[in-house]
UniProtKB/Swiss-Prot annotation:
<feature type="compositionally biased region" description="Basic and acidic residues">
    <location>
        <begin position="564"/>
        <end position="575"/>
    </location>
</feature>
<feature type="compositionally biased region" description="Basic and acidic residues">
    <location>
        <begin position="1310"/>
        <end position="1328"/>
    </location>
</feature>
<feature type="region of interest" description="Disordered">
    <location>
        <begin position="556"/>
        <end position="575"/>
    </location>
</feature>
<feature type="compositionally biased region" description="Basic and acidic residues">
    <location>
        <begin position="512"/>
        <end position="524"/>
    </location>
</feature>
<feature type="region of interest" description="Disordered">
    <location>
        <begin position="1192"/>
        <end position="1241"/>
    </location>
</feature>
<feature type="region of interest" description="Disordered">
    <location>
        <begin position="357"/>
        <end position="383"/>
    </location>
</feature>
<feature type="compositionally biased region" description="Basic and acidic residues">
    <location>
        <begin position="1117"/>
        <end position="1131"/>
    </location>
</feature>
<feature type="domain" description="J">
    <location>
        <begin position="1377"/>
        <end position="1450"/>
    </location>
</feature>
<feature type="region of interest" description="Disordered">
    <location>
        <begin position="1254"/>
        <end position="1328"/>
    </location>
</feature>
<feature type="coiled-coil region">
    <location>
        <begin position="1219"/>
        <end position="1257"/>
    </location>
</feature>
<feature type="compositionally biased region" description="Basic and acidic residues">
    <location>
        <begin position="908"/>
        <end position="923"/>
    </location>
</feature>
<feature type="compositionally biased region" description="Basic and acidic residues">
    <location>
        <begin position="1147"/>
        <end position="1168"/>
    </location>
</feature>
<feature type="region of interest" description="Disordered">
    <location>
        <begin position="241"/>
        <end position="318"/>
    </location>
</feature>
<dbReference type="InterPro" id="IPR001623">
    <property type="entry name" value="DnaJ_domain"/>
</dbReference>
<feature type="compositionally biased region" description="Basic and acidic residues">
    <location>
        <begin position="1192"/>
        <end position="1226"/>
    </location>
</feature>
<feature type="region of interest" description="Disordered">
    <location>
        <begin position="961"/>
        <end position="1046"/>
    </location>
</feature>
<protein>
    <recommendedName>
        <fullName>Auxilin-like protein 1</fullName>
    </recommendedName>
</protein>
Length: 1450
């Protein structure tokens, strides 16, 4: 084997020293196995070393070579069997090594260091290093160290905890260069066993505590060593896999080193799985204390380079081992001494990882133990991402918390950010405390308040070492100690304490001594330890408004949960929400004020919440009216900022949080928020109020507490105080109503300024002082606070634009629908007389001025009806639980007919006269009693006639009067006794789900004499008009039935308004006290709705005199201030007088109403039928249109295809005609040429014959002349003979010359010969003529066939082409499919393709096919022209495929 040997004679102990920085703790078993591990060489894997160390066979000379030299030196051969000692039996094999080496070590960058810390570091270096170990300064770079990527995994998390549950850091070996680390790791969530699968480990980053403060250190950049070790192999066995560029950071008392583990470290961790399991036994000793180990303690590193000596390997190894042990003991003793010196000044401020509850115990001054409930689960999550080696910084812990908070609460990305986004500035703790105290002094001086009421973050931080077990910080690399000056946090209890003091000062009522004592005992434990002289300026108080308001809305809107749910779970979720939000707030405060705000999430894990809450402020208590045990909610701490709720408030509204007690939010915070809202809109600035009302409708519930505060102040001591705990349903509904009155507060003050006001000056002054107190608490010294608060309102306007547009669109649709229904309804009334309506309108003309007075109020609260739909679901839930389902359903039906009778009810808005209302109330009350006796009448009939617009007017007025009653409590309480009696009389109607509603009782509230006189005049006028109406009703009943019905409708309008008010108030006034208070005001209506309406109409129709008496009795009741006994007695007397009347006319009214309902039902059915018909027509039209479109599309497509086809046909025909013409021209040319040749031959033959005959004639004439001279007597005979011979041989005999010459000897012989010749010539000419005729017949036949072929060519060519497509030059395919083109009548027997596999079978089939389709064979068989044409084409295709087949075969 070959190893690299160092050229320098470096000692073995120096090797240990240089490599000491690679480890921090080791186990007790097989500690020094790493001494004998060697660097992994590509030539020799680890398994080879294991085989060598164990030895092979019985040979005692197989001893492993244990020297591990450096890798950058020359090579030398080593004899493995040079030693006799088997070290494997002494030190154990690699597979059994049990030391623990961290895969990653923490390195913290040192950015800025104070001079004190630097001096202390130098002192520690001097005292902590031995003479033979070189010092490593901050800037000094070690060549043995290389960078390893940080992955937020602390080394000590792989070490299990001890019996006490705490974890300590095993003493760093003495041979490690540089000062001894004094880092203490407190992490209870440790891995007991490293599994083979990948298990990410969360990061635990710690700061080094110092006596003077905390410092952050930066790791110096190191140069890489000459050899790069694949760091990924280190974690091959324990499942932790990283990249080779990862860096491991090591803490050394503020000095940072970048360490790269050598290959021996890789060998160690690549052992068996059991080695990883033995890591669980490494931990011993408590946290923050280093214990001295024995000689065999884990003080030797698991890997280092050893110098090799060829001759004495064992001797040098033993010497180096002893020296390493001694140095380790020395180092450990030094470290122990240094830790003892630091015990007194140590301070730990860590925050645990878990966001859940944790228990913290304080064991002395040096032991810190943290037990986190969910830390094991959190260990499976990597909270920081890998960073590049060049960056060499920790992953931001704040980002990790922000991610976890966003994941837990479903908050969008941009809302929660960690404090690492801030740009930190490093300050001393002393300066921070001084600056904090200065801010507190200025705040107390500004408010002139005693110290300790408001507490800041720094005070809580100072009391932590006393009240709580110290927690450790979890800093970012970039995060430093940050002052908290601009952003204090307040508890609800602290705010409630101040509020309670103010309330007691004005009301004289004290909170129960029992709870006060309990509060004092609990607070003393905390307040005594907090600095009393700290309080923030007014800007910080203003910053608390948005978060407090958000928290209130969050508590109120969340459904009430059962009492059985543990209070600890409530605190955990609330604290998580607050802490997650305070990170965002601290970031905003830093950007605006320039201060670095420390995130309040230091308590987000709940580590100190429980302890703090137990000792915290418990002043947020609310007394119930009997003084029983109060319900106390634990105070929640919040760090607030002025701009936090701009984006976060919308998310918190939807966040499900456990419901806390309403008294907490009502008592301590809500009133302050409400006064700050009032401060935004001054009384004179009505436009600003209106704008705020329209733009911020969702913030209405925060006004609830201001009502409660003032009610506590105004309530007499003898009466029951309204400051009591209400159910969630009552509070939600009452809050929504009260906010209507508060929104129009300033507008109502302007209206009331025209009339005299009689108010209690003492209570009014108290109210003013209390208002100014809260205004001062939440208003800055300059206009910055107001501007920021106003900007908060302005910022939400944009978010409501979309909602308002959608709401307006929805309302328009509803208005159109209702108006359509109204038109149908009005159509049934078109024949009625209009005189009564005009009279009714004239009666109302005198009161139009009242409407003008309230026009501004209607404008201010016009948006309330739009917001009714937003809160419809909340109102429904509240009404169902309180038994108001019936009233809510009535209100919903009223909303459906909101604008149906807009014109008829326009003048009802001014019907606010209290005296007239009392008269109507008495009448309806009497008729209600009669109706209760007679039985129930169908209540659904009049329900459809309700008019919403009239109800809207009175809903607005109810809100105004409720607010006025708050301002004048004495007048309101004066009527409370009357309310009780009225409630008793009308208990049945209240139980049915309806409640009596108050209206504008201006005489009681204004208290002005002039107003009372004017109302008295109006009362008289109303009485006269009422008598006239009753008289006219009686006359009309006897005369005209239609006129009577019209008067009924006029009277219904008034009753509808009362019903609308009753239905609205049933939802608005779930509280019993508010119902009673509403019932006592002047404008009283019948609460039963339809029954009161029917009774009232029947009484007015039937008995004019009886109702006159009722009006007189009512008038007397109105003149009385208390009106209790007289009202009751008059109702009883009048009930006896009118009971018979109502009983007789109940059926008539019921029939009348039934007819109306039937008419409306028929109209509704007709409308539905029309809608259905229209829908069917529309669908039929749509279907017809779709069909027409489809047909049109098809027609267009067909036309396009036809045009294309027409364009293609001429082209094809032209091509076919050209081809036919070519073929015809060739045949015709051939026939013409043949014909010409035949004619020429005939002409030549005829010319020859004519010449011969002429020649014979001339010769015969000459011979005859000579014979006549010779023989004179025989002239005539010879002439006749010559004539016969010439005639008989004219065409046959051509050479008559010799014959004539021979005939001269024999007279009869030449004549026979000439005859024979002529016959021969005749036969020849006949044969020629026959041949010519035959030829002509053949030519004609050929021409016919050609014509037929041309006619069939187009169709046959298409068939042949279709058959041969894809099979060109494929002989097998053509032959196997030949039957498809030839046809069944051809007689061709198909040949399957399976028979054409071999070449021989293909050749045989080809010959058979060619014989069958050959043109000559077809001619012999007498085939038709079509068959001939097809066979010719097939023959040509087969011939071409055969040529291709032959080429392929060759």
């Amino acid at each position: 084997m070959e190893y690299e040997k160092s050229p320098t004679a470096t000692t073995f102990s120096r090797k240990i020293s240089n490599n000491r920085s690679h480890s921090l703790s080791f186990s007790a078993n097989a500690v020094y196995d790493g001494v004998f591990s060697s660097p992994v060489n590509s030539k020799s894997p680890l398994v080879d070393y294991g085989e060598i160390f164990r030895g092979s066979g019985p040979s005692p000379s197989s001893i492993p070579f244990l020297d591990v030299p450096e890798l950058n030196v020359g090579k030398v051969k080593v004899d493995v069997r040079s030693s006799k000692l088997d070290y494997s039996s002494v030190f154990g094999g690699l597979g059994a090594c049990d030391f623990a080496v961290t895969p990653k070590e923490v390195i913290i960058k040192s950015e800025k260091k104070t001079s004190i810390n630097e001096d202390k570091k130098r002192n520690r270096r001097k005292g902590g290093n031995s003479s033979d170990v070189p010092l490593c300064n901050e800037g000094k770079k070690s060549p043995e160290m290389v960078r390893m990527k940080h992955s937020d995994i602390s080394y000590h998390q792989t070490v299990p905890r001890n019996e006490n549950g705490a974890t300590h850091l095993t003493q760093v070996p003495a041979t490690m260069p540089g000062p001894i680390p004094t880092q203490v790791v407190d992490n209870t969530s440790l891995l007991h066993k490293i599994e083979s699968k990948s298990t990410p480990i969360p990061a635990v980053e710690k700061k080094l505590p110092c006596n003077e403060g905390r410092e952050e250190v930066k790791a110096s950049r190191k140069q890489g060593s000459k050899t790069e070790v694949d760091f990924e192999n280190i974690f091959a066995r324990d499942g932790c896999s990283t990249r080779d560029d990862s860096t491991c950071k090591t803490v050394s008392n503020g000095e940072y080193r970048d360490v790269k583990p050598p290959s021996s470290f890789q060998c160690t961790l690549n052992g068996e799985h059991g080695a990883s399991e033995r890591l669980s036994g490494l931990n011993s000793g408590p946290s923050e204390r280093y214990e001295t180990e024995d000689a065999d303690s884990p003080s030797s590193p698991p890997y280092f380079d050893a110098e090799t000596d060829e001759n004495s390997v064992a001797a040098e190894s033993s010497a180096a081992l002893k020296k390493a042990i001694e140095e380790a003991q020395i180092r450990m003793n030094i470290a122990k001494q240094m830790m003892e010196k630091k015990k007194s000044g140590f301070r730990s401020c860590a925050k645990l990882k878990s966001c859940d509850d944790s228990k913290i115990e304080n064991k002395g001054n040096t032991k810190v133990e943290g037990i986190t409930e969910e830390s094991r689960d959190n260990n499976s999550q990597i909270l920081g991402e890998m960073v590049k080696p060049s960056e060499q910084s920790f992953s931001n812990e704040g980002d990790q918390h922000a991610k976890r908070a966003r994941k837990l609460w479903g908050v969008p990305e941009g809302l929660l950010k960690s404090t690492s986004d801030h740009k930190p500035e490093e300050l001393e703790e002393q300066d921070i405390i001084t600056l904090e105290e200065e801010q507190a002094r200025r705040g107390r001086k500004h408010w002139e308040l005693p110290g300790g009421i408001f507490k800041s973050v720094m005070n809580s931080k100072q009391q932590e070492p006393e009240n709580l077990a110290p927690a450790k910080p979890e800093p970012d690399t970039k995060q430093e100690v940050q002052p908290i000056t601009e952003n204090p946090f307040y508890t609800f209890g602290q705010l409630g304490s101040k509020l309670k003091c103010v309330v007691e000062a004005f009301t004289g009522s004290k909170v129960s001594q029992k709870d006060e004592k309990q509060f004092t005992e609990k607070e003393n434990s905390t307040v005594t330890q907090m600095v009393q002289d700290e309080e923030s300026d007014s800007q910080e108080m203003l910053a608390g408004i948005p978060v407090i308001e958000t928290y209130l809305r969050e508590v109120e809107e969340t459904p009430q949960q059962t009492e059985s749910k543990s209070e600890m779970n409530i605190e955990e979720k609330s604290e998580s929400t607050i802490c997650a939000f305070t990170e965002r707030s601290s970031q905003n405060m830093e950007k605006e004020t320039g201060w670095q705000v420390k995130s309040a999430c230091k308590f987000e894990d709940g580590s100190g919440v429980k302890d703090f809450q137990e000792n915290g402020d418990h002043t947020c208590n609310v007394l119930d009216q009997e003084g029983e045990k109060e319900i106390v909610s634990e105070p929640q701490e919040m760090l607030v900022g002025p701009d936090d709720s701009k984006t976060y408030v919308r998310e918190v509204e939807e966040t499900p949080t456990p419901s806390l007690n309403k008294t907490q939010s009502d008592d301590s915070v809500g009133a302050m928020v409400s006064f700050n809202r009032v401060n935004i809109s001054e009384p004179g600035n009505i436009d600003e109020v209106q704008e705020a009302v329209h733009k911020v409708p969702r913030r209405r519930r925060v006004w609830k507490t201001s009502e409660d505060v003032y009610n506590m102040i105004k309530a007499p001591k003898g009466n029951n105080r309204p400051w009591q705990l209400e159910s969630a349903e009552n509070e939600t509904t009452a809050m929504s109503f009260h906010e209507e009155g508060v929104r129009i507060h300033h507008a109502s003050e302007e209206i009331e300024s025209t009339s005299g006001q009689a108010s209690d000056s003492g209570l009014q002054e108290n109210w003013t002082v209390l208002k100014q107190m809260f205004r001062q608490m939440f208003q800055t010294a300059d206009t910055k606070g107001e501007d920021e608060t106003y900007c908060l309102v302005e910022s939400e306007r944009g978010h409501l634009d979309i909602h308002q547009k959608a709401q307006e669109k929805y309302e328009q649709v509803e208005v159109e629908t209702v108006r359509t229904n109204y038109e149908a309804y009005a159509h049934t009334r078109e024949n009625e007389d209009e005189s009564a309506q005009e009279t009714y309108c004239r009666k109302e003309d005198g009161k139009v001025e009242v409407q003008g007075k309230t026009s501004l109020v209607r404008e201010l609260i016009g948006e309330e009806l739009e917001m009714a739909s937003l809160e419809e679901e909340d109102v429904q839930e509240a009404s169902e639980e309180a038994g108001w389902v019936q009233g809510l359903s009535e209100l919903n039906e009223i909303n459906e007919h909101a604008d149906s009778h807009a014109e008829m009810l326009e003048y009802d808005r001014s019907e606010t006269d209290s005296n007239n209302s009392r008269e109507r109330f008495d009448q309806t009350q009497e008729q209600a009693e009669e109706t209760m006796i007679d039985g129930s009448i169908d209540t659904d009939t009049s329900r459809s006639s309700f008019e919403m617009r009239q109800g809207d007017s009175y809903i607005e007025e109810v809100g105004i009067e409720q607010h006025r009653s708050d301002q004048f409590p004495e007048k309101a309480s004066a009527v409370s006794n009357t309310e009780e009696h009225i409630e008793e009389i009308d208990s049945d109607s209240i139980q049915s789900g309806w409640s009596v509603v108050e209206d504008d009782d201006r005489s009681l509230q204004d208290g002005g004499a002039s107003q009372a006189e004017s109302k008295h005049d109006e009362l008289e006028e109303t009485k006269e008009e009422s008598d006239e109406m009753k008289t006219s009703l009686g006359v009309e009943r006897n005369g005209d039935k239609k006129e009577l019905e019209h008067q009924f409708e006029c009277q219904e309008n008034e009753t509808y308004r009362s019903n609308v008010e009753a239905a609205e108030s049933s939802c608005r006034f779930p509280n019993g006290e508010e119902i009673i208070g509403a019932a006592t005001n002047g404008n009283m209506k019948e609460n039963e709705g339809e029954e009161g309406e029917e009774s009232c109409r029947s009484s007015m129709e039937e008995e004019g005199d009886a109702t006159s008496d009722i009006g007189a009795a009512t008038d007397g009741n109105m003149k009385e201030n208390e009106g209790e006994e007289s009202c009751r007695s008059s109702m009883e007397e009048e009930g006896d007088a009118t009971s018979d009347i109502s009983q007789n006319k109940a059926e008539t009214v019921e029939e009348h109403l039934k007819k109306i309902d039937e008419t409306r039902e028929k109209e509704r059915e007709r409308k539905q039928e029309r809608v259905m018909v229209e829908r069917a027509i529309r669908e039929a039209r749509e279907r017809a249109f779709a069909d027409a479109m489809e047909r049109a599309g098809k027609t267009a497509m067909e036309k396009a295809k036809a045009v294309a086809h027409r364009r293609e046909v001429p082209r094809k025909s032209e091509k076919g005609s050209v081809e036919v013409n070519d073929k015809l021209s060739s045949a015709e040319k051939a026939s013409m040429q043949a014909k010409l040749r035949a004619e020429r031959a005939a002409v030549e033959r005829a010319i020859t014959e004519v010449r011969e005959r002429a020649m014979e004639k001339a010769l015969s004439g000459k011979s005859a002349a000579s014979q006549a001279k010779s023989y004179g007597g025989s002239k005539s005979f010879s002439s006749s003979g010559e004539r016969r011979g010439s005639s008989s041989s004219g065409t046959e005999n051509k050479s008559s010359g010799p014959s004539n010459s021979s005939n001269q000897t024999a007279k009869g012989e030449p004549i026979q010969r000439c005859k024979a010749r002529s016959e021969r010539h005749q036969r020849t000419s006949d044969r020629a003529a026959e041949a010519l005729a035959e030829k002509k017949l053949r030519d004609l036949k050929t021409q016919k066939e050609q014509t037929e072929r041309n006619r069939l060519a187009e169709a046959l060519d298409a068939d042949v082409k279709r058959w041969s497509s894809g099979k060109e030059n494929n002989l097998r395919a053509l032959i196997s499919t030949l039957q498809y083109i030839l046809g069944a009548e051809s007689g061709w027997k198909p040949i399957p393709l399976t028979d054409l596999v071999s070449s021989a079978s293909v050749r045989k089939a080809y010959r058979k096919a060619t014989l069958y389709v050959h043109p000559d064979k077809l001619q012999q068989r007498g085939a038709s022209t079509q068959q001939k044409y097809i066979c010719e084409k097939v023959f040509d295709l087969l011939k071409e495929a055969w040529n291709k087949f032959g080429a392929d075969e060759r």
